[in-house]
A protein has these predicted regions:
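Internal maturation/activation junctions in enzymes
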Residues: 1-2, 14-74, 127, 151-157, ...
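Short connector loops/turns at beta-strand edges and beta->alpha or beta->beta junctions
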Residues: 13-15, 85-86
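Catalytic alpha/beta core of large soluble enzyme barrels
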Residues: 69-197
């Protein structure tokens, strides 16, 4: 039976560690985590094959499963898991409104909320400005000198939104990730409307 193990909340994870989506640190984390997922999923499939045997279509492989890893969009799951980023995608905005059958809700990036709280900037005025700027924090002057993480990264680099991130970085990370994935990868890119075709 094929499986599709993947990740949920990649951008949230990077932000919680103070790692910008762009750069060598994020690429290192991509390689480290996805290689570990590959190692552990193959180990588990071999262990299951020892207990339950290899299915006919896996005969001679030592595995219980034909496929183990895939990257899928996980928007619904990310909401259920506590408002974390979907799958491998960056956050589209650090604050946004969401409409559902139960009403309209304001969703905030919880990691950013903690950073703002730690710097005594978690105010309605700041969130209003972020919302007015389409979810971006780049125009919040109070954050100009705020650093975070082990490498003292500027907060404005860590909390860039999907459209603010160089899209080539998403492609680079997908290339790193693909060598550890044995199924397809769903990857979205965001280009400005004025970008040439």
């Amino acid at each position: 039976r094929p499986l599709g193990l993947g990740v949920l909340g990649w951008h949230t994870y990077l932000q919680s560690k103070g790692i910008p989506f762009e750069g060598l640190s994020a690429q290192y984390e991509t390689r480290k985590i996805f290689s570990q997922i590959k190692i552990e999923s193959e180990r588990a499939s071999r262990a299951l094959a020892e207990v339950y045997g290899e299915p006919l279509w896996c005969n001679g492989t030592g595995f219980r499963n034909t496929h183990l890893r895939a990257i899928a969009p996980t928007v619904s799951n990310s909401k259920l898991a506590g408002n974390i980023s979907p799958g491998i995608e960056p956050w589209a905005a650090n604050v946004f409104t969401e409409q559902s059958a139960k009403g309209t809700f304001i969703r905030r990036n919880t990691v950013l909320e903690e950073v703002l709280e730690d710097n005594e900037l978690n105010t309605p005025e700041i969130w209003e400005q972020i919302l007015k700027d389409g979810g971006s924090i780049q125009n919040i002057e109070e954050l100009d000198d705020v650093l975070m993480g082990d490498w003292d990264e500027p907060v404005k680099n860590v909390f860039k939104t999907f459209k603010e991130i160089n899209q080539l970085e998403l492609v680079n990370q997908a290339g790193i990730r693909q060598q550890y994935i044995d199924q397809s990868v769903s990857l979205n890119l965001a280009f400005p409307s004025q970008a040439p075709p």
